[in-house]
Amino acid sequence: QIKIKPAYLISGGASGRNFYNNFNYNFIKIFLIYFSSTVFVIFLYNLIDLRLLDAFNLSFTTISSGGFIPTENLSNILGNNLQIFILSITLLFPIFNFFLLHDIITRKFSFRNYQEDLHIGSLIVILTLLFYFFIIPNEGFTNVFFAITSSLSTSGITIYAPDLDLSFFFILLTIVGGSVISTSSGFKYT
């Protein structure tokens, strides 16, 4: 006779034990990471003089990988390079692993556990520098960085309107960013 174990008893979860037995612990931990990240991003957006409603919507866009733009054109919200750069930095949150910030804060960080994030970070730096210096040197650094992080985070938002059509490359970057673990709910969980 074959015994089938119910899916909720399969071991796993944030602590590596039975997810069902640790559901409350895992739920609270994940909720606090999402909540604190969202509040931190809203705080950052308020520091760079974005309206509260725009900051609220953009924080949901960055944390959950897209979908909450309050206007048709993002350039109506972002007025200077500092705002574009901060938005690009906050787009890095859903690109990297879910517990990366948690492990850094709790001093449990190890490069061995986050090799994929190291590769993605290296890819972002290399592609941004390559595009800025060789492919589209007339475009500003913040716009290039924003286009790369937006594509890799699969959010699909941009203010970049190039003379040179790089749509195919940005679509490939979106595929690469979407194929790394999971971006269906924003943060990546491994």
What are these regions (language model features)?
Residues 1-190:
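Membrane-proximal intracellular helices of multi-pass ion channels
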